[in-house]
Swiss-Prot record:
HAMAP family: Ribosomal_uL30_B
UniProt protein name: Large ribosomal subunit protein uL30
GO biological process: translation
NCBIfam families, per database record: rpmD_bact
InterPro entries, sorted: Ribo_uL30_ferredoxin-like_sf (IPR036919), Ribosomal_uL30_bac-type (IPR005996), Ribosomal_uL30_ferredoxin-like (IPR016082)
Encoding gene, per UniProt annotation: rpmD
Keywords: Ribonucleoprotein, Ribosomal protein
Organism: Bartonella henselae (strain ATCC 49882 / DSM 28221 / CCUG 30454 / Houston 1) (Rochalimaea henselae)
MF-aspect GO terms: structural constituent of ribosome
GO CC, one annotated term: cytosolic large ribosomal subunit
Family: Belongs to the universal ribosomal protein uL30 family.
Subunit structure: Part of the 50S ribosomal subunit.
Pfam families attached to this UniProt entry: Ribosomal_L30
């Protein structure tokens, strides 16, 4: 069954501020999973526990810009 997204779903804006060079493959894959692949790129993501966990794993490489 397909679930529809509600209009009031929370989002979080994330910006990549660090380079994945000299970081582990897991951290590179986490950045790719967040949709970030180049410096200073921003993504608006749904605010879920999974996304928050991914942000926590690469907290030295990303910055949370906006939580709405």
């Amino acid at each position: 069954m397909v679930q529809k997204k509600s209009q009031s779903s929370k989002t979080v804006t994330v910006e990549q501020i660090g380079s994945p060079i000299r970081n582990s493959q897991i951290q590179r894959a986490t950045l790719k999973g967040l949709g970030l692949n180049k410096m200073h790129r921003r993504r608006v993501l749904e605010d879920t526990l999974c996304v928050r966990g991914m942000i926590a794993k690469v907290q030295h490489l990303v910055r949370v810009i906006d939580e709405s």
